[in-house]
Amino acid sequence: MKIYNHKVESFFASSPAAQFAKTLPGGKSGTLVAAIWAELGDAQGRWESSRHLQAEAGAVPVTKASGKSRVVHFRFACNKHLRYTMYWFSFVSLNHSEWAKLYYRGQRDNGHSHHQALRALGAKWLKIIFVMWRDHKPYDENYHLANIARQKMRQAA
């Protein structure tokens, strides 16, 4: 298994995407970030927006509405490998990212289960990863924290 992991890591390191993908929390070692990028592929027009990527990964629920009834439930039709990879990436990010830890704690405080909170965190990460993948830009924790602060200021105004 160690040999396999080493081969995956070395193959991914030679990829052009590795230079910015490895900037994700926990991306410097292991095969988790490589697995995410393998699922994303290199077809730039594959998803129109981060919302489409989130749906592909099963990170957002399905809403069925008819007349006065409205039901929201877990998304079963999705890329299971990407969903599983994002679930574990979200879990790992709790140890490497302060905002991720705070977001997860906020979800738990709102009554969500551990799994629901990780899926919600995965949806947040997919927005960030989509922009990184589309624009070939590295992840910058400080830039993301500044965006969060700007959004909170807009909501308060």
Which functions belong to the PLM regions below?
Residues 1-157:
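A detector of single, family-specific signature residues
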